[in-house]
Amino acid sequence: MEQISSLLAAAAVGGFAITAVAGKFMIPALHRLHFGQTIREEGPTWHSKKNGTPTMGGLCFILGILATLGIVWVMYSPKLPEVLGMPQLQAGMLVLFLAFGSGLIGFLDDFIKVVRHRNLGLTEAQKMILQIALTFGFMFGLHSLGLLTTQVQFPIFGLVDMGLLYYPIAFFGIIFLVNAVNLTDGLDGLCTGVTFVSMIGYLLAGSLLGFVHVSLIAAATAGACAGFLVWNFYPAKVFMGDTGSMFFGGIVTALAFVMQRPELVLFFGIVYIWDAMTVVIQRTYFKATHGKRIFRMTPIPHAYEMRGWREVKIDGFFALIAGIGVAMGIFYICVA
């Protein structure tokens, strides 16, 4: 137990330190490359002052997480297979597969935006094709490792065998969740702070359920979130871009699936799901009513902006909601 605690502490500290230091060097480099964000014209007018803020800053914490896990591997390599076991090591690699694959799609999207100096990168069709291919690879990996099960533990209903229905729901659910995290990256520090809280949930869940690899990746990611907040907290000196938010989406989603507990995303990803559902509801209602809206603006954090809330207040509010979701999830694990 002491060995695992030191492993997790090293991952968290390493993730923080490497990401924070990476930002010190990467932000000036992004400035020199003119990799600035183009702000949406339909967004709040006061966001125009953010125009030109460096984007693709997610590279900082991707580097931080990758380097941290690599250092931990070298430091603990004689004992790591014994502590984790080969199945957990393989499952950990599968988490990184979805995370880095999603991050690569986000990187392509960001790169097109900065090269063309507009806020539209990959088309929706291009992004969907890439995500379908990536998700197929991830689910094939789950199947190969014996982690793809049709039995899901639902709150209240208990263990339910969904049969063949599970596969399409899981497939498109993964794509939905990755994009939901991407949608949450709309304000300075918002997605970073919410993901930090979500990772605390996964760290605790992994510890309670015996999935050390989940706790290890969550600890490194939580540390990296804290390190990135040094640069991304309001007023942000850098944005994570789709590179970072898609990467986070991959981690948030994959961690639940490799534990064979996808229902935990309902708790640990409550803010992302809420955010995405408001967009879906708004678009559906807008089309059905030929121009009417339910919310003043979506994703929903912007609706609070329109009410006059400051970004820091909105960040704190959604981090609190994420914390409540984590608390509910941990309680659910303990009583289920």
At which residue positions do the language-model features occur?
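Carboxylate/His-rich catalytic cores and anion/metal-binding grooves
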Residues: Q126-F140
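Hydrophobic transmembrane alpha-helix segments characteristic of membrane transport
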Residues: L108-R116
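Membrane interface segments of multi-pass transport proteins and intramembrane proteases
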Residues: V115-T123, V152-V160
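Juxtamembrane helix-loop transition segments at the membrane interface in multi-pass membrane proteins
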Residues: H34-F35, H117-R118, T243
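Alpha-helical transmembrane segments
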Residues: M1-H31, F61-L108, F136-H143, V152, ...
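Alpha-helical transmembrane segments and immediately membrane-proximal extracytoplasmic
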Residues: Q37-P54, P81, P87-A91, H213
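Juxtamembrane helix-capping/reentrant segments at transmembrane boundaries
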Residues: R40-P54, H117-L130, P301, M306
